[in-house]
Amino acid sequence: MDRRRFIKGSMAMAAVCGTSGIASLFSQAAFAADSDIADGQTQRFDFSILQSMAHDLAQTAWRGAPRPLPDTLATMTPQAYNSIQYDAEKSLWHNVENRQLDAQFFHMGMGFRRRVRMFSVDPATHLAREIHFRPELFKYNDAGVDTKQLEGQSDLGFAGFRVFKAPELARRDVVSFLGASYFRAVDDTYQYGLSARGLAIDTYTDSKEEFPDFTAFWFDTVKPGATTFTVYALLDSASITGAYKFTIHCEKSQVIMDVENHLYARKDIKQLGIAPMTSMFSCGTNERRMCDTIHPQIHDSDRLSMWRGNGEWICRPLNNPQKLQFNAYTDNNPKGFGLLQLDRDFSHYQDIMGWYNKRPSLWVEPRNKWGKGTIGLMEIPTTGETLDNIVCFWQPEKAVKAGDEFAFQYRLYWSAQPPVHCPLARVMATRTGMGGFSEGWAPGEHYPEKWARRFAVDFVGGDLKAAAPKGIEPVITLSSGEAKQIEILYIEPIDGYRIQFDWYPTSDSTDPVDMRMYLRCQGDAISETWLYQYFPPAPDKRQYVDDRVMS
C-alpha cells in the first residue's frame, strides 16, 4: 500500500495539461486583467468554457508523466522546501481595496513535481490572464535553491495555492489546495486535519489506485470586503477529466465549500469515488492496540457519520485494523455523510504538537440527486500518526464506461460540529475492554474464567430521559457470536446512558464481527444506529495470561 506514503509529505500527482493543450482551447482577447502578478495574454473564460475544455481533453490521450524538475528543486529536502516563502507583497489580491481574503502560491519542488497553472479572472468581463512562475514571487531564505536554474522557466508553474483571511492575512491560511487533487480547510481553531479530494479512482479494486490532478485553477478576482471567493479547476487523469467550480465561504467559525463538477470518462472505471476524504485514525477510546505512547488518543477523525436517504442516522466508529478493511454501505440519494472529530477535550489527547482536539470535521451534503450507490469506507493498518489510513467516498451504483458524463453538486462543511445532527439520542463514545465479569467487580485475585470482550456505548441527547421510565431497550444484532450481560447504566456526568454488553464467540472464526445496535422505547427507535466492526483474536489468544509475580 505505497499509495498512501506521500499524503503526509510530498504528495504524488498525476497528469498535467501542457501549455498548448489549454491555450488552444481559449479564445484570445485584448483586455488587461487587474491583477499585478498576472502577466499572460488575455483569454475568454467562464465555467461553460472550462466544461468544454474538460470534455475535449477527454477525447485526447492522457499526457502521462511530468517532465523533470530542475535539479535544484528535485533534490530538495522537506526542511528546505518549507523554508521557501511566497512574497506577501505579491499576493493575488494584494491590490484589492479592503480585502478580507488573499491568495498565495506554493513553489514547485521536492515531491511536488506536476506543475499547476494559475489564472486571474475578471468576473465582470470573463477575461483571464495567466500568472507565470518567476523567482521574484518567492523568498528563498536558506532553502539553498540555485535560482539561476530557474531563470527563464516561466512555464514551471506552481504546486498549489492557499488562501488567507483577515485579520490573519499572510499569517494563517484557512484553505489549501496542494498535491494531486487534495485540498483542506480549517475552522476557527486554524488547525488543519483531514483532507478532501476532487476525485478517487480505484481506491479498493484489483487495479492500481489512480490519483487525478488539478492541473489549472482560475480565480475570480475577489470583491472588496468579501469573505467568499470562487475558483475553478481543471482535473485530468488517465481515466477521466473534470471541470470543477468551488464557491468557498470563509466564515468566522467554519469554511463552507459549494462544489459543482462535470466529469468526462476517458476509460471504463471500476470504482469512481465522489466527494472523497482522507483522514487518520491510529487509536481511540474503542481501539487501543496502537496506543503505546503518552497520548490517550491519536486521530484526525473518530467516526463516520451517515444520514441515509430514508432518514436513518448511523454512527460508525473508526478502526485501525490489523488487516486492510473495506466496507460499503448502500444508500439511495443520501442526505449527508462525513468523517467527524467530535471529541474536543484536550485531556483526551494530551498532544501539544498535533492538537487533535482542534481538528475539524468534514461533512458532505449532496445538492442534487445522487441516486443509488454506496458510501465506501477503507481502513488501512497504521503504526502511528504519519499515515493517512482512512478513506471515505460515495460510489455511484452505475458502472462507469468510456464516454460517460456525470455531474455532481455538493456542499462541504469544515467545522467543529456538522451542520446537522440526529434529533434522536446520539452516540458520544465507544469503549472496549476485557469482559466476562459484572461491572464494578473486575476480579483482583484472578482473571475471569471465560474469555469475552466488553463493549460500552454511550448515548446522549434526544428523549432518553423521558424514555427511561417507560423502558429503554437495546436492539443488538451480531453477524456472529453472542451478546450477554447486557446492562443499561445512567451516566450522570454526561447525562446519558451507557449500553454495555459482552461478546462471546461461538466459533473459532477470526472473520470481522459486524455489530449493530440502536435504542427503542415501546417499539419506537429513540437513537441513531451504532455500527461497529470487531476483529476477534485467534482461538489460542482467547485467554487471559496471568503474569503476576507474587513472591
Curated annotation (Swiss-Prot):
Task: Provide the leader sequence positions.
Answer: 1-32
User: Coiled-coil ranges per the record?
Assistant: none
Q: Which Pfam families match?
A: MdoG
For the biological process aspect of GO, one term held by this record is:
glucan biosynthetic process
Localization: Periplasm
Q: How is it modified after translation?
A: Exported by the Tat system. The position of the signal peptide cleavage has been experimentally proven. Can also be exported by the Sec system.
UniProt lists the family membership as follows: Belongs to the OpgD/OpgG family.
Q: Which HAMAP family match?
A: MdoD_OpgD (MF_01068)
Q: Can you say what this protein is called? A: Glucans biosynthesis protein D
